[in-house]
Amino acid sequence: MTITQVKIKKLENFSGSLPEYATEHSAGMDLIAANEQPITIKAGAIQLIPTGIAIALPDSFEAQIRPRSGLAVKHGITVANSPGTIDADYRGEIKVILINLGKEDFIIEKGMRIAQMIIAKYERILWEESSSLMETMRGSGGFGSTGV
């Protein structure tokens, strides 16, 4: 497995620990809330939650912000734009867009694990316009065409 070093900056509102892998085979690192005061996410509402960190990803890398399964299943708290994308040239604070799909208001306390971040390599492409595409068995079938 290749290890890539990424620069991370603690901002003024940072508290707690840097994102880290929970187990040897974890794909994601937990992101920690860095809000000064508790933030209430009302049922059905969306809130932007600060993490107190900024990162400098190498070229051809992105950070994906994804929900934590425990928050989703127990409280209906998930990432509204999942996965959120942090581009390699972004240098601002990483913030997480959380939505409360539950029936009860939910309070985000400082230091709470609110999402997970996955660092992923990607490739850029060039479009090649074509008047036709290679046929496949699936063709244009989508939205459940291969079964439920």
Curated annotation (Swiss-Prot):
What is this enzyme's class at the first EC digit? hydrolase
Q: Which controlled-vocabulary keywords does the entry list?
A: Hydrolase, Magnesium, Metal-binding, Nucleotide metabolism
Q: Where does substrate bind?
A: R68, S69, G70, N81, T85, I86, D87, K95
Q: Indicate yes or no for the key word Disulfide bond.
A: no
Domain of life of the organism in this record?
A: Bacteria
Q: Which reaction does it catalyse?
A: dUTP + H2O = dUMP + diphosphate + H(+)
One GO biological process this protein is involved in is:
dUTP catabolic process
Which cofactors does this gene product need?
Answer: Mg(2+)
InterPro entries on file? dUTPase, dUTPase-like, dUTPase-like_sf, dUTPase_trimeric
Q: Which NCBIfam families match?
A: dut (TIGR00576), PRK00601.1 (NF001862)
Supply the name of the protein. Deoxyuridine 5'-triphosphate nucleotidohydrolase
Q: Which organism is it from?
A: Rickettsia massiliae (strain Mtu5)
UniProt lists the gene as dut
